[in-house]
Structures are given as C-alpha cells and as structure tokens.
From Swiss-Prot:
Specific towards N-containing N-heterocyclic substrates, including isoquinoline, isoquinolin-5-ol, phthalazine and quinazoline. This is Isoquinoline 1-oxidoreductase subunit alpha. Its EC number is 1.3.99.16. One of its GO terms (molecular function) is metal ion binding. Residues 1-77 form the 2Fe-2S ferredoxin-type domain. It comes from Brevundimonas diminuta. [2Fe-2S] cluster binds at residues 39, 44, 47. The gene is iorA. It catalyses: isoquinoline + A + H2O = isoquinolin-1(2H)-one + AH2.
Length: 152
C-alpha cells in the first residue's frame, strides 16, 4: 500500500506493485487521463507531473517514489482550468493535436514557479525534452511569456 497526496487529496493505492510506473497508477487506477503516455522512457515529456512542485516524468517514476509525497497532475494544476498557462495556451492557439499539451503545461508551470519572468533562453532550456510532434515550439514560448506577464 502506498499513500500520497494527489491534486491536494489523500490517496491510498493498494494491490498495485510498488515499482509500477506512476503514470499507469494515475491513469488506470485513479482514472485521471490528462497525463499522457508518449514514449515510456521519460524522453518526450508527455507524462510530466509535479512531485512536490518539481516536474517529473511519471512514466519512469515508480509508485514507491511518491509515498508520502505530493503529486499534481494537469487536472490539479487549476481545478477551474484557469491557470495563467492554460489561458495563455488557448489565447496563443498553442494546441494542434494537443497530445503533448498537458506535459508541456506542467513543465512550464514548474519553470514559472522557479523563474517568474523567464528569458527565451531559460524557456528553451526548461522545455528541452518536452517534444511536440506538431512543432508549436514558438507558440509555446510565446504562451509562457504571456502567462508570466499575466501572473505578475
């Protein structure tokens, strides 16, 4: 049995191996489908969540790592879907297929928590490894700048 906080609520996971990927626990056992499976190797960023406020790849994070920790998924970033990044994503028309967006937003949220007004270089560095098969990287960067201004 593993207990942790998920999106602000206590969760107890039983009958799941401790080495099961957090991604599968969140999606299959806890029925939160916003976090996506991309590569399964932690290389694409589609599965990004926050563990204690830090961006982490949930596809390679064993469930045991989050015992007594706080995990936030895209569903918990803002229950009203009104986080500055979510609004900026819409305003800047970032999504095309949308598959990578939850991971992109979660990675960007971790960046803005550390660096409230990031430079282009800081954005590029922080977002490196979050892949977008549609190539909307420029719009992602613009949306992050927009969210930073809005949050200030």
């Amino acid at each position: 049995m593993i207990e942790f906080i998920l999106n602000g609520q206590p969760v107890r996971v039983t009958e799941v191996p401790e080495d099961a990927p957090l991604l599968w626990v969140v999606r299959e056992h806890l029925k939160l489908s916003g976090t996506k499976f991309g590569c399964g190797l932690g290389l694409c960023g589609a599965c990004t969540v926050h563990i204690n406020g830090e961006a982490a790849r949930s596809c390679i994070t064993p469930l045991s790592v989050v015992a007594r920790q706080s995990v936030t998924t895209i569903e918990g970033l803002d229950p009203q879907h009104a986080h500055p990044l979510q609004r900026a994503w819409i305003a800047e028309q970032v999504p095309q297929c949308g598959y990578c967006q939850s991971g992109q937003i979660m990675q960007a949220a971790a960046l803005l928590k550390k660096v409230p007004k990031p430079s282009d270089a800081q954005i590029v560095e922080a977002m490196d490894g979050n892949l977008c098969r549609c190539g909307t990287y420029q719009r992602i960067k613009i949306a992050i700048h927009r969210a930073a201004k809005e949050a200030a």
